[in-house]
């Protein structure tokens, strides 16, 4: 399998020169380690060291005949805890949107009387041990109806309440939606509703869905912050930029209400984009296209720098996989770009972990400050409606009279 990996990269890699690496020598260097591998995980490690010599993004390995322990599902409530007065207190209930069933947690369901600040005291009648991780009491309870004992006080007494909930097995989507909504609300508050916020998680199907869903809810804002930090890539996001760069072709006058801009699915105000080093592949290309289109400033940190792509290659004999880059990006001026470097910001803002752990976001704050300036100096102002015409007995154009 080691030799197959070496051959697959030799035959499928997008550049015949293998990025200048002496590929036969790498086979000798790392091949001597194979005899010392005692598990498939060991072999994956050696294969990873081999292909890392190419210094190329999207060079993957994994899977195969691996040994894995049996996992047990853990029920989750979609909330945060803190240890207080010898008991676990619920400090935050994550809520992404009551309209989205995937973004509504167990504690946000109708009839569930649990609030932030309540203490979680018992699970199915068994008192919660404050010396252990609270999740240990939820092992095997995912998707099952569970009785919670909660109270405003850190003790079980006559005021404690019994509440039935159904824990979920994965709360990542709930927390994801909650984070987006918190950012959107923060931007709304800090700009008096003048600036919109859109988060794009990747450049695949989910990213396109999220972009469109959030765009149409905020296209009436004077300006937009497009956040693509941690963008996982997927496809080349030309359609994303086409939506953000769609010009108005005309307006429609109506007797009642505000005149219509056309096409209706467009936004003409200033924009900016948030980027960081955890956005890559399509997440490298998205800000690059955004900048090429002249849509606005890039704010944050340089992106990951992985703009090569995969188009398929053989798997290994035990169904393990290797991913070989089969095509790579270069610019229209005939120079290599982005791969191995990333897309640079126009305004560099370094994250401060000490602030972020408490909910702060220096990059988002910088984007808000920038956009408030942009809408004042470069805001979009639609044309005034022309004077109502007099068409009494004549055509509109001179030759029609």
Task: Locate the predicted segments by residue.
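Amphipathic, well-packed alpha-helical segments that form the structural scaffold of globular domains
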Residues: 3-10, 27, 31, 48-55, ...
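Sequence signature of WD/YWTD-type beta-propeller architectures
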Residues: 1-34, 38-49, 60, 341-342
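In a subset of proteins, long, contiguous C-terminal domains/tails are tracked
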Residues: 220-222, 331-401
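Cleft-lining beta-strand/loop regions that shape enzyme active-site pockets
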Residues: 8-14, 18, 100-107, 121, ...
């Amino acid at each position: 399998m080691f030799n197959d990996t070496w051959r697959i990269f030799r035959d499928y890699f997008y550049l015949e020169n293998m990025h200048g690496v002496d590929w036969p020598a790498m086979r000798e260097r790392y091949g001597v380690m194979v005899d010392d591998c005692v598990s498939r995980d060991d072999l994956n490690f050696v294969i990873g060291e081999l292909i890392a010599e190419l210094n190329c993004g999207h060079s993957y390995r994994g899977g195969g005949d691996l040994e894995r322990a049996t996992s047990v599902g853990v029920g989750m409530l979609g909330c945060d805890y803190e240890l207080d007065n010898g008991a676990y207190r619920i400090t935050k209930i994550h809520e992404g949107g009551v309209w989205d069933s995937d973004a509504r947690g167990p504690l946000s369901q109708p009839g569930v009387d649990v609030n932030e600040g309540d203490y979680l005291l018992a699970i199915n009648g068994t008192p919660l041990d404050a010396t252990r991780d609270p999740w240990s009491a939820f092992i095997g309870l995912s998707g099952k109806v569970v009785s919670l004992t909660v109270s405003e006080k850190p003790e079980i007494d006559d005021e404690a309440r019994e509440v039935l909930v159904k824990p979920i097995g994965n709360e990542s989507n709930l927390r994801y939606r909650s984070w987006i909504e918190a950012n959107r609300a923060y931007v709304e508050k800090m700009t008096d509703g003048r600036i919109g916020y859109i988060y794009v998680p990747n450049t695949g199907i989910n990213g396109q869905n999220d972009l469109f869903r959030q765009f149409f809810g905020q296209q009436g804002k004077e300006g937009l912050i497009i956040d693509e930090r941690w963008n996982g890539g997927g496809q080349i996001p030309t359609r994303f930029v086409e939506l953000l760069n769609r010009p108005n072709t005309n307006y429609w006058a109506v007797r009642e209400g505000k005149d219509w801009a056309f096409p209706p699915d467009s936004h003409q105000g200033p924009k900016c984009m948030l980027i960081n080093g955890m956005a890559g592949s399509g997440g490298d290309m998205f800000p690059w296209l955004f900048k090429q289109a002249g849509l606005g400033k890039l704010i944050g940190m340089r992106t990951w720098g992985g703009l090569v792509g995969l188009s398929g290659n053989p798997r290994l004999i035990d169904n393990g996989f290797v991913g070989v880059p089969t095509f790579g990006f270069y610019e229209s001026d005939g120079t290599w770009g982005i791969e191995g470097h990333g897309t640079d910001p126009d305004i560099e803002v370094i994250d401060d972990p000490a602030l972020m752990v408490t909910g702060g976001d220096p990059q988002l704050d910088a984007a808000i400050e920038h956009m408030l300036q942009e809408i004042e100096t470069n805001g979009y102002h639609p044309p005034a409606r022309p004077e109502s015409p007099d068409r009494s007995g004549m055509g509109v154009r001179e030759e029609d009279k």
